[in-house]
Amino acid sequence: MSLNPRDAVIVDFGRTPMGRSKGGMHRNTRAETMSAHLISKVLERNAKIDPAEVEDVIWGCVNQTLEQGWNIARMASLMTQIPHTSAGQTVSRLCGSSMSALHTAVQAIQTGNGDVFVVGGVEHMGHVGMMHGVDPNPHLSLYAAKASGMMGLTAEMLGKMHGISREAQDAFGERSHRLAHKATVEGKFKDEIIPMQGYDENGFLKVFDYDETIRPETTLESLATLKPAFNPKGGTVTAGTSSQITDGASCMIVMSAQRAQDLGIQPMAVVRAMAVAGVDPAIMGYGPVPSTQKALKRAGLTMADIDFVELNEAFAAQALPVLKDLKLLDKMEEKVNLHGGAIALGHPFGCSGARISGTLLNVMKQNGGTLGVSTMCVGLGQGITTVFERV
């Protein structure tokens, strides 16, 4: 395929192993240290790229305080081989932060405002809890449902509206762990996981090159025993069908097609379209439907044209209505989250957008796909989507 000089292409992707937030592998590693290690290793394996060419490090992070404060993009960049002459900015679109980081870089490239960008994101949810320092305006309840800030209750609402049964949610949760374990055993994650030192459950330092969050022993029977996590009386959403609270980072190198060609670099994919959309915060998990419809329209495509999809699994009760309305339920086994998702791998907020996008590109490469969509819901009622074409 032919590319325009100002097309934005992805030339590499890497991520940390996903660690449990409670006593997990990253418990003694700071968020900016994790980010810097990842950025450094991804740049090291792309020797044709001079770090001095990096225009901007654009890093997603939601709770920007404590070790994640004071512009963690710049903090991490200063700890890498990227020179001080390159810039850094931290962005937040809650769950969609690192996908927004990608979109920001793509827009800069398309408009001639840079040729080489490092994008991604991090969230150390073990060190900086999701609600640490958060003080929502009490007047917000005059404009949106009071429970809109309680993600589990929005999932309960969406699941109830779409008639999603507890059994269907449990089956989706079991699938996530089963497929993630299968991908691990078959080495499907080896190109994306950047090994990192961490501590095992006994406190011994070791190198991790796998996700410690996956539970291969998960069964429908074990999931059926779990109690509702958010609505004790009549709820259907459990811890086993919710994204895990984890620690991790993800990183992409994004370039103009012209600069990649000049350096003799074969891109993984080109970004064909992007979109964001808003929905009622009470059903925040529905956001991927309008954002994906908008992105596909901009690309001149329909969902039937798409080979593979990565949908962030915030909750099974949220993912299943999205798949239903995107006409993907009957195609799920052949198209959607073939290596599992956030129920098994976790959802470190600032990390996930680039993580699912990079995993998508590897799924496309491993299975011969040409067109792919990565999409996710965003807290308080948004969706964000990227359409990729493999080159």
Curated annotation (Swiss-Prot):
Query: GO molecular function terms here?
Result: acetyl-CoA C-acyltransferase activity
Q: What EC number(s) would the UniProt record show?
A: 2.3.1.16
Tell me the compartments it is located in. Answer: Cytoplasm
Chief localisation class: cytoplasm
**Which InterPro entries does the protein's record reference?**
FadA (IPR012805), Thiolase (IPR002155), Thiolase-like (IPR016039), Thiolase-like_sf_Thiolase (IPR050215), Thiolase_acyl_enz_int_AS (IPR020615), Thiolase_C (IPR020617), Thiolase_CS (IPR020613), Thiolase_N (IPR020616)
Active site per database record: 95, 347, 377
Q: Which Gene3D superfamilies match?
A: 3.40.47.10
Q: What class of enzyme is it?
A: transferase
| GO biological process, any | phenylacetate catabolic process
The protein's annotated catalytic reaction(s) are: an acyl-CoA + acetyl-CoA = a 3-oxoacyl-CoA + CoA
Q: What does this protein do?
A: Catalyzes the final step of fatty acid oxidation in which acetyl-CoA is released and the CoA ester of a fatty acid two carbons shorter is formed.
Cross-referenced NCBIfam families: AcCoA-C-Actrans, fadA, PRK08947.1
The entry's family comment says:
Belongs to the thiolase-like superfamily. Thiolase family.
Q: Which HAMAP family match?
A: FadA
UniProt xrefs under PANTHER family: 3-KETOACYL-COA THIOLASE FADA, 3-KETOACYL-COA THIOLASE, PEROXISOMAL
How does the record describe its quaternary structure?
Heterotetramer of two alpha chains (FadB) and two beta chains (FadA).
Which protein is depicted?
Answer: 3-ketoacyl-CoA thiolase
